[in-house]
Amino acid sequence: MTEPDLSPAFVLHTRPYRETSQLVDLFVASMGKVSVVAKGSRSPRSSVKGLLQPFLPLHIHYGGKSSLKTLLQLEARSPQVALQGERLFSALYLNELLYYLLEPDTEYPGLFSGYFQTLLALADQQQLVSPLLRQFELLLLQQLGYGADFCYAADSCLPIDPACYYRYEPEAGFITTALRDHAFFSGREIIGIAEQAFSDEYILAAARRFSRQAFAALLGNRPLKSRELYSAFIARRSE
């Protein structure tokens, strides 16, 4: 009997199901977001009880013809990525974006490896958190089909001018404007975001502002729990 092919995966979200099982949303390398039922995974003697955790690289096998698959095999392929404090909440933020925005059973080439590399980079205390988040956000937007054109203005098709100002319209792109306030971007900022020149704090702040606008349009009114948890963490630390 041949061994089943195992797919690399990460857990995005779990919730209890019936008495001893779980419903699990997975990020699978070859299939994007996949929802499975892990039968008996909450029972005391379950062999997979401690494996359905976020940030633990997994190999999985699942089956079924409905949108809810059945988890058939699960094993850890390397140790859990060690994350604490701000870095943990940042990784939870990435998981929420993937959970809410990925289409079920849809492959996103390059996104899985980008996610894994971002987790590893977040675990490296020598790397700054904010640039890593901005890089992944840009990758995710591009993979979702909402990547902005940072080279040309949507209204004129002219190259972005460092001396001009633009507003961002999620369905269109950057549109030239004469107004200037916190919601608008200079051409210099847009070019800097395109180049991912995030060692420049001015560009890094603009990239964060851009991501907030872009994801607000996609997430709608859905609140991100990771932001609430991080705010509570900061409040407790400052007491």
Swiss-Prot record:
Q: Which GO terms describe its biological process?
A: DNA recombination; double-strand break repair
- What cellular-component terms does GO give this entry? bacterial nucleoid
Identify the keywords attached in UniProt to this record, alphabetized. Answer: DNA damage, DNA recombination, DNA repair
Q: Which top-rank group of organisms is this from? A: Bacteria
In the UniProt record, does the keyword Zinc occur? no
Q: Which InterPro entries does the UniProt entry name for this protein?
A: ARFGAP/RecO, DNA_rep/recomb_RecO_N, NA-bd_OB-fold, RecO, RecO_C
The answer to keyword Zinc applying to this record is no
Q: Which family does it belong to?
A: Belongs to the RecO family.
Role description: Involved in DNA repair and RecF pathway recombination.
Q: Which PANTHER family match?
A: DNA REPAIR PROTEIN RECO
The identity of this protein, by name, is: DNA repair protein RecO
Q: What is the species listed in this Swiss-Prot or TrEMBL entry?
A: Tolumonas auensis (strain DSM 9187 / NBRC 110442 / TA 4)
- What is the name of the gene encoding this protein? recO
